[in-house]
């Protein structure tokens, strides 16, 4: 689960992570009041008005602006709130700006990157440090790997002081800035583990000309599987920032991710779903979604899956790929037929069913009289997807 920057900073502040003072605003009037308060409390000649959306690249897209007065903050907020911000992470449709973070200005001297996430290859947390702050860490890792330090952290022992000192030394910090950075990194790791985060990313971490070490931006992603331990964090979820199809799918416990292709796919099992998407691509189509209906696919989940797939107007054909292990293929076939009649499917649906009672399922599909095309194996399914798209 993702949250906004201002929410992430509020959480980090409770763990002693240094962040600039900021006030969230939902209107130009609130932005002006926030700026007035910050100008009274700080010596900086500017405040920063930042659009709050679940996407990076806001600065380049015009979502981060400086204001030298409360009146200017009001004008900036008037232009931002209600507009659609398009960044390299939002896609061409962009995201609507509904709230802003008005924050004290910083006299920045240097910018760095600090991030913590899970390294699945080693089953350990990894602390990532880079001297290239403000840049995408993937780009840094690819183009200038010598400027990125990765420190594996044993979850049994946690982040050790010598590891935090190694990170601060890598950044070239000295004296009080060195000690502040060590304290910052230790506090960030404590926050990361305490809240069961999947990612804690500070980009950039800044050192001001006055010597302060702060998180200028903060991205916190929660491990959704651990949210039952942090029910108060559920209140931080902003559904308006999420894909409406994915929100609807989650209500039916379906794992759905919308893509930009033309072939909808419904599969049971994440691995099979990934393979099915590859098959669609090789067949000349483009997957319109990732949809895993789970190991216990029922007529109800199949029906909901079809509804969600059909709500995407770019879909020209649907491939259903089910391996019947726990779930019986004839039960899934019955769900497909029932859903097709109920919804009124008018797109070609290619169905590949293998496993328990697959022969019975095949017969049910053949005798249904519906536009359901049975496929015998993955290769045949791929060929029939190609034929359906070219028809």
UniProtKB/Swiss-Prot annotation:
Residue positions binding substrate: 268, 325-327
Binding of Mg(2+), residues: 203, 217
Essential cofactor(s): Mg(2+)
InterPro entries reported in the protein's UniProt record: ATP-grasp (IPR011761), ATP-grasp_succ-CoA_synth-type (IPR013650), ATP_grasp_subdomain_1 (IPR013815), Succ-CoA_synthase_bsu_CS (IPR017866), SUCC_ACL_C (IPR005811), Succ_CoA_ligase-like_bsu (IPR005809), Succinyl-CoA_synth-like (IPR016102)
GO annotation, cellular component aspect: cytosol; succinate-CoA ligase complex
Recorded catalytic activity of this chain's protein: succinate + ATP + CoA = succinyl-CoA + ADP + phosphate; GTP + succinate + CoA = succinyl-CoA + GDP + phosphate
GO BP terms in the entry: succinyl-CoA metabolic process; tricarboxylic acid cycle
Ranges where the ATP-grasp domain occurs: 9-248
Pathway the protein contributes to: Carbohydrate metabolism; tricarboxylic acid cycle; succinate from succinyl-CoA (ligase route): step 1/1
Domain of life: Bacteria
Key words of the record: ATP-binding, Ligase, Magnesium, Metal-binding, Nucleotide-binding, Tricarboxylic acid cycle
EC numbers for this chain: 6.2.1.5
Annotated ATP binding sites: 50, 57-59, 103, 106, 111
Gene Ontology terms, MF aspect: ATP binding; magnesium ion binding; succinate-CoA ligase (ADP-forming) activity; succinate-CoA ligase (GDP-forming) activity
Function text: Succinyl-CoA synthetase functions in the citric acid cycle (TCA), coupling the hydrolysis of succinyl-CoA to the synthesis of either ATP or GTP and thus represents the only step of substrate-level phosphorylation in the TCA. The beta subunit provides nucleotide specificity of the enzyme and binds the substrate succinate, while the binding sites for coenzyme A and phosphate are found in the alpha subunit.
Subunit structure: Heterotetramer of two alpha and two beta subunits.
Family from the record: Belongs to the succinate/malate CoA ligase beta subunit family.
Protein name in the entry: Succinate--CoA ligase [ADP-forming] subunit beta
Gene label: sucC
């Amino acid at each position: 689960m993702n949250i906004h920057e201002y929410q992430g900073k509020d959480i980090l502040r409770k763990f002693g992570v240094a962040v600039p003072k900021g006030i969230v605003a939902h209107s130009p009037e609130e932005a002006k009041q926030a700026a007035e308060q910050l100008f009274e409390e700080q010596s900086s000649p500017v405040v920063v008005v930042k659009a709050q959306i679940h996407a990076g690249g806001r600065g380049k897209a015009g979502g981060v602006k400086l204001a030298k007065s409360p009146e200017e903050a009001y004008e900036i907020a008037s232009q931002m709130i209600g507009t659609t911000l398009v960044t390299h992470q939002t896609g061409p449709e962009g995201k609507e700006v509904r709230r802003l973070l008005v924050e004290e200005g910083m006299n920045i001297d240097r910018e760095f990157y600090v991030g913590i996430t899970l390294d699945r290859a080693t089953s350990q947390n990894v602390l990532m440090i880079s001297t290239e702050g403000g840049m995408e860490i993937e780009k840094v890792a690819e183009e200038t790997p010598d400027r990125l330090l990765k420190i594996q952290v044993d979850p049994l022992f946690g982040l050790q002081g010598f590891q935090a000192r190694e990170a601060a030394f890598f950044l070239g910090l000295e004296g009080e800035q060195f000690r502040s950075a060590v304290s910052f990194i230790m506090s960030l790791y404590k926050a990361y583990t305490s809240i069961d985060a999947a990612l804690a990313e500070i980009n950039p971490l800044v050192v001001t000309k006055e010597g302060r070490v702060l998180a200028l931006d903060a991205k916190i992603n929660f491990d959704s599987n651990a949210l039952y331990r942090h029910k108060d964090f559920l209140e931080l979820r902003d559904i308006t920032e999420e894909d409406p199809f994915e929100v609807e799918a989650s209500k039916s416990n379906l794992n759905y991710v919308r893509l930009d292709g033309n072939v909808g796919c419904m599969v049971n099992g994440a691995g099979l779903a990934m393979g099915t998407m590859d098959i669609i691509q090789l067949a000349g189509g483009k997957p319109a979604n990732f949809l895993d209906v789970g190991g216990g696919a029922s007529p109800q989940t199949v029906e909901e899956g079809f509804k969600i797939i059909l709500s995407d107007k770019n879909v020209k054909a649907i491939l259903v790929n089910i391996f019947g292990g726990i779930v019986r293929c004839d039960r899934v076939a019955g769900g497909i037929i029932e859903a097709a009649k109920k919804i009124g499917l008018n797109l070609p649906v290619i169905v590949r069913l293998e496993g328990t009672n697959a022969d019975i399922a095949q017969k049910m599909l053949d005798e249904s009289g519906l536009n359901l095309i049975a496929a015998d194996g993955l290769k045949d399914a791929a060929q029939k997807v190609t034929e359906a798209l070219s028809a």
